[in-house]
């Protein structure tokens, strides 16, 4: 992603309860792990995040707020997953999603991911937030 992409992403605002995913305006750590997703006209529609740890690939993503809730998530998720697999060749793909985000969890389950655990992370702005760990079942 370019500096302009990160600046645009920082302006994205999600409706409740998804405002948890709004940018905190802090510089992104490890920007080289982020990839821009664009439509046919070149407009930024989302981002992909990958972190490889040995043969396990952590996958994260975000879809532009005005595109959420329109049944685009599964195709977007699968396209990003294929991109990550082609780039990193992992033996396992895993992700972490806020437990309240049932909409995303359903998408990930439809894509073949299953819950493998839960953990709590503490945020200055949000306090304690439960996350679901999910692994791809192949």
PLM region descriptions:
Residues 61-78, 99-106, 110:
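Conserved glycine-rich acetyl-CoA-binding loop
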Residues 59, 73, 84-86, 125, ...:
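Alpha-helix termini
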Residues 3-68, 77, 83, 87, ...:
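Acetyl-CoA-dependent GNAT
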Residues 90-94, 98-105, 110, 114, ...:
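C-terminal "cap" of GNAT-fold acetyltransferases
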């Amino acid at each position: 992603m370019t500096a302009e992409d990160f600046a645009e992403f920082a302006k994205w605002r999600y409706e409740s309860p998804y405002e948890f995913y709004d940018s905190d305006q802090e510089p992104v750590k490890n920007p080289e792990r982020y990839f821009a997703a664009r439509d046919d006209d070149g407009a930024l529609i989302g981002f992909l995040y990958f972190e490889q740890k040995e043969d396990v690939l952590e996958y994260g993503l975000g879809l532009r707020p005005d595109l959420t809730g329109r049944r685009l998530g599964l195709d977007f998720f699968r396209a990003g997953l294929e991109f990550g697999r082609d780039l990193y060749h992992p033996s396992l793909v895993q992700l972490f999603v806020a437990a309240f985000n049932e909409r995303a969890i359903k998408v990930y389950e439809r894509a073949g991911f299953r819950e493998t655990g839960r953990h709590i992370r503490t945020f200055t702005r949000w306090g304690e937030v439960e996350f679901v760990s999910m692994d791809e079942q192949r």
